[in-house]
Swiss-Prot record:
The encoding gene: hslU
HAMAP family: HslU
Subunit-structure text: A double ring-shaped homohexamer of HslV is capped on each side by a ring-shaped HslU homohexamer. The assembly of the HslU/HslV complex is dependent on binding of ATP.
Record bears the keyword Zinc: no
Family: Belongs to the ClpX chaperone family. HslU subfamily.
Coiled-coil ranges from the UniProt annotation: none
Residue ranges of the region described as Disordered: 137-156
UniProt keyword annotation of Cytoplasm present: yes
Phylogenetic placement of the source organism: Bacteria, Pseudomonadati, Pseudomonadota, Gammaproteobacteria, Alteromonadales
Task of the protein: ATPase subunit of a proteasome-like degradation complex; this subunit has chaperone activity. The binding of ATP and its subsequent hydrolysis by HslU are essential for unfolding of protein substrates subsequently hydrolyzed by HslV. HslU recognizes the N-terminal part of its protein substrates and unfolds these before they are guided to HslV for hydrolysis.
Example of a GO MF term: peptidase activity
Protein's name in the database: ATP-dependent protease ATPase subunit HslU
GO cellular component: HslUV protease complex
Superkingdom as given in the UniProt entry: Bacteria
Amino acid sequence: MSEMTPREIVHELDAHIIGQQKAKRSVAVALRNRWRRMQLDAALRHEVTPKNILMIGPTGVGKTEIARRLAKLANAPFIKVEATKFTEVGYVGKEVEQIIRDLTDTAIKLTREVEMKKCRTRAEEAAEERVLDALLPRPKNDWDNNSDDNSSSRQIFRKKLREGQLDDKEIEIDIAGPQIGVEIMSPPGMEEMTNQLQSLFQNMGQAPAKRKKMKIKEALKQLVDEEAAKLVNQEDLKEKAIELVEQHGIVFIDEIDKICKRGETSGPDVSREGVQRDLLPLVEGCTVNTKHGMVKTDHILFIASGAFQMSKPSDLIPELQGRLPIRVELDALTASDFKRILTEPHASLTEQYVALMATEGVTIEFTETGIDRIAQAAWQVNERTENIGARRLHTVMERLMEDISFEASDKSGSKFTIDADYVNAHLDNLVQDEDLSRFIL
């Protein structure tokens, strides 16, 4: 789990996302509160529940990007889901409990990586012995002389192996077969039976080992993973993963505005209000049955986001509104924001295009006037047509760089300067003509 302070988290987010300080501060505090809660004594810790967040803002202002970056910073089980992918229990489609099952799978993978790192040294030693056995098979009759000769030879080969002198030599080794497993499609409400059937097939064991011929460098890598997997206790792994989900899990639900009820409808609203009703127990706290065990959702942090262009937060059912107490409004982007997006973030758009063209031997230089004009063009198109936020920059940049990208392979050694004149020559007609910009930009 991340031990970064809120200020450090915001600083990391600033490297990738321009503006939106309120949203950054809210998620930073929420993430830090996970750490603070774990410092309390057990009795009080159980009473402290996470304050779930609802992020509200137009499309393309950074809601999803904040989630993506937060996932890397959290160092905890994290899953991002689209609210529109789910339907009410009892109808065809994914039910919301699948969110917790997927989150638990993520935790299992995360915990397995941590546990395998802990026993990596022992795994490397075991893998080394298996490679040496393939290079120098142990004698069947273990006479003293043979044993001494073999031991000295093994030490010589061990030294060469560690120095990388044998990396390209080919050997034949037995590689463990994959775990036997069967994916079972089940109707809603039958997940428990499905999990039991999957466990039954998994208990049948692994497929038999196969003898393969490969280079020592590749063989060592596979054998280390295989030996590390043997050293990890699977039951302990599941217990730790479930504990990790329950205490540190984070769920990001995108497009939650798309499941708001719109006007009066006849018949059951299974993909909107029905999904909201199913989300209630998850957000409030319930127990979900997964193939790894029972998972309590009481202390999982939920962050929801939506543009709310065709609806408003009050269109969510009141019970769900009450379970998302922290509201954060993200601001629409201005032309000056677009300019900063083009230059300031790590691996900015201009930096990406410069690096891509450099692979063809073409030098690209973006002047300040050129960047100003690109930002202004993107903002103008957003104002005149549909406002899609920073995503408009991708469309404008791709259109601007189209000719250079096509001809770059034939113009190695050339240099192009993207200034205001170049931008005007390539984009002015499209930006000024509303019909063209609507269909092309």
